[in-house]
Amino acid sequence: MTITDLSGRWEVCLDESKADALPQKYPDRINLPDSTSNAGLGALNTEMEYGCLTDLHKFEGFAWFRREVEIRPEMSGKNLTLFLERTRKTRVYIDGNQIGEYCSLCTPHRYDLTGLPAGKHELIIRVDNTDYPTGGGHLTSRDTQTNWNGIVGRIELQSYSAYPEYVYAIPDPDKKTLHVRAWIKGAHCGTASLRVFDVTQEYGSAAAEFSDEKPLECDIKLSDSAPLWSDSDPAPLSLELDLDGDRCTVTTGLRRMSADDRTLLINGRQTFLRGKHDGLVFPQTGYMPTDVDSWLKFFETLGEYGINHVRYHTCCPPDAAFEAADILGIYLQPELPFWGTVPDEFGAEHKFLREEGWRMLREFGHHPSFVMMSMGNELWGSKERLNELIAGYKAEFPDKMYAGGSNNFQFVPCVLEQEDFFSGVRLGRDRLIRGSYAMCDAPQGHIQTERPNSVHSYDPLIDEAAALAGTQVIDENGEIMIQYGTEMKKVKAESWDNISVHVPVISHEVGQYAVFPDFDEIKDYTGPVRHEAYAAYKKGLEDAGMLHRWKDFFRASGALAVDCYRRDIEAAMRSSMMSGFQLLDIQDFPGQGVATVGILNAHMKSKGLVTPEEWRRYCAETVVLAELDRFVYSASDEIECGLLVSSTEPGFSAEKILWELSVDGTVVDSGASDIREQKGRIYRAQSVSFTISCDKPTEARLHVSVEGEAENEYTLYIYPNIDIEITENYISGGGKRIEITHDPETAKNGGALCIPTSDENSLPGEYCTDFWCYGMFKSISESMGKPVPTGTLGLLIDNKSELLKDFPCDTFTTPQWYEIVSHSRCADLDGTDIEPEVWVIDNPERRKRLGLLYRKDGAVCCTSRLWEIADRPEVKWFAYSLMEYLGK
């Protein structure tokens, strides 16, 4: 094949009116590949977006691109193809004559220009980013990569005698064979030579005939030395087809992803997906890159945080992403660009989607990293049509694992006959398989509702034969109110609470723990998009007199979010019946209300909240886990601790789990516990127990490890026994007593603690940080008639305050605050300049001044109802610290 690169200078005409006639003038210029917005073309967008990024040169309509191309004499008489790697709807003209039009949102556009005579010709490409045949999901959404217009990948003239338009290889790692199928263009019949190799050697070869009537098809037997491909040992192979001098090389690999009941296997051994959601968010350009180096950098960053899997939400990345994932060992799950209801009979939209799926499989299916595929996001409608769709793909491309969608049917999930894995958030109304949910999707998860612990497992919920029926979910008409995209809708429902799942279970969109924005990121938006929401939040915080605290809010909320993610991930790691999770997200999501839920910002840069090494302690191929039913203890408690390892590492052979308990850097107890039981990837050791003596509140560190493999650490909060009484009227102990009053005036002169009665402006205390983003789910809850989210982001604590002198703590939320927060209503201090000792961090959209412990007009005020939790050791010491200060 001879390639003529058409990248470079093109003339442009932008037409929002979408006139069908060829333009008379092309007033602008652009260097393709690029988008019109990134090139700064079109009018400046004066409409600022606050629920997503603002595209400074937003353009929707026809973009006409023109340039001269030359067909050299040696190209004349050969087959000639115009190749456009990634674009929108296109139409092509040569010398003023329409050649054709094409619509694929996920795959290259190819135009047959065979027969074009030698010489110079006018080439015009019209790109239309309106009226797509489907909604497009994250492929065309302003919430992710923007609805760009342009051509953002390779632009080429390809000339050849014969060439495979598509090449597909079905690997059989057991037999060490590749079954190759190729669709040949340009020759009526012939013989192709095939060989498989890598940089070190050739592993096999074959010859195969082809004709117009049938594709090329053959088996290539590989040598025993041919390596297998997996996440832990990626070994991509090159497959070359030689068609009488016209050569084509694609990447393939020997791998099989399969299932044994609920266990996910790679090449016959267990694997576990440590995944992230991805919507192709690249704010620097507003569209995804199409070069391998950019994707290597992207996946290498993910690998630093232990991620081995990416689920593409209603989108499909370009070939370069698969190529990079092949090299680094990342499991990819592209998805049809659809988010909605599947009809009983396919109309134009679903016929397009079906064909788009075929195009995705034929274009990218040879890549070993392409292991899974989903039919869309949160689908409703016809199970029969979904089954048929999967069955068709599976018959031709059997080496993929398929799901009817991600989190289909929501409250009433099912497993379709053709599905190879289940991706969802629940197996019934109360069978919850992730740690957090929006209020409109209640009941909420264990991270939101349980005292912090490290024992929660999803196994009883996955294995449960029957679940409690959600009597309040399905109405008398058999309908259910659900979140539908970013809005709400009623759909027909069936009762599937008793489903039994015997395919791998993948937890969908895990996390969504909000972090206060990092306003320093504003300066990073130097491309075609701006973060106007951040600017608005910053101005609003300044108007509220709290801008000086934003970095503190950011760090404190971030520390809590990291801990929430950790406990959610560890719950999945502990669950032997779980086969993986897909985080939403370690990367911020700049749309759908602006969801700052990442430990990385939208540019994939670290926020400085957690190091990769710290994150990999609980998100890696091998993770050591301690099981503790709580993290707060009395000094007299005997602490029971389970010890286990989750490992899918080939050759894992540890025999013991080592544990070490330290206080103030001094080891006070240690041991080695024999691994006695294995259940799949879970290796369980003998439990241990210990006590920690102390005469003052103490933090202890429990360090667990397996020699040479992995380590983890847990913080325990230990409180000595103290003789203190807490009632609704007083706190007393050690000969001291302070009164509790509900009137700040009474507490002005000291000697009394004000615990004010809640008013309509106070908010319920919540330990966990907000889910996703306040604005979006407040709107959805109101539309559904459901409770609105509280919307707070944890605590910011002045841990040097005299009020907390006898209650040592950090500056952010930790488990010792769980009971105190959960039994409080935070005070609304708007209109004051009070700087609380314990702030409750509000979300940046509402940005109220909220306090749990603060001073007002000389009175010390605490909004926690301490008498309700008077038996808790940490509460006794918190009350003691307040009493010591107020009793002076």
Regions inferred by a protein language model and the residue ranges of each:
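Short alpha-beta junction capping motif
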Residues: 730-776, 857, 862, 885
